[in-house]
Amino acid sequence: MKTPIELKILDSRIGSEFPLPAYATPGSAGMDLRAMIDTTLTIAPGETVLIPTGIAIHVADQGLAAVILPRSGLGHKHGIVLGNLVGLIDSDYQGPLMVSCWNRSDSPFALEIGDRLAQLVFVPVVQAQFKLVDEFDSSDRGEGGFGHSGTK
């Protein structure tokens, strides 16, 4: 299923030097976002920086949202993860997409112009309406949490 999402190019290198975000394979869930920086950026150990992607989107459909997620290789191999862990893009947001990058490793990391640094995934949204109750109906789990089911 393909849903049209409005995209605005904010950096002219997108679509010329670097491709528009796209799915790498038919089974891909996310589209790569690139670091649209002007020069190589070294992220020091423990440092967090905000990186422009060169695009803005408008999801518009209130039944959808977008999430910005880390790329697994950057986190596992280099310790580069998202500073906010997950970026949530509401359907009515129309501003630039930025990626908060946190270097949780002990080594500096050089981010190059156009590097793929995160992925954009669209997800369905359900807006809940709370129903106040005095007690919950019982369940097998009850209030058990934080490892209550064990590790094996």
Curated annotation (Swiss-Prot):
InterPro entries: dUTPase, dUTPase-like, dUTPase-like_sf, dUTPase_trimeric
Domain of life according to the entry: Bacteria
Enzyme Commission number(s): 3.6.1.23
Pathway info: Pyrimidine metabolism; dUMP biosynthesis; dUMP from dCTP (dUTP route): step 2/2
Keywords (A to Z) from UniProt: Hydrolase, Magnesium, Metal-binding, Nucleotide metabolism
UniProt function note: This enzyme is involved in nucleotide metabolism: it produces dUMP, the immediate precursor of thymidine nucleotides and it decreases the intracellular concentration of dUTP so that uracil cannot be incorporated into DNA.
Designated name of the protein: Deoxyuridine 5'-triphosphate nucleotidohydrolase
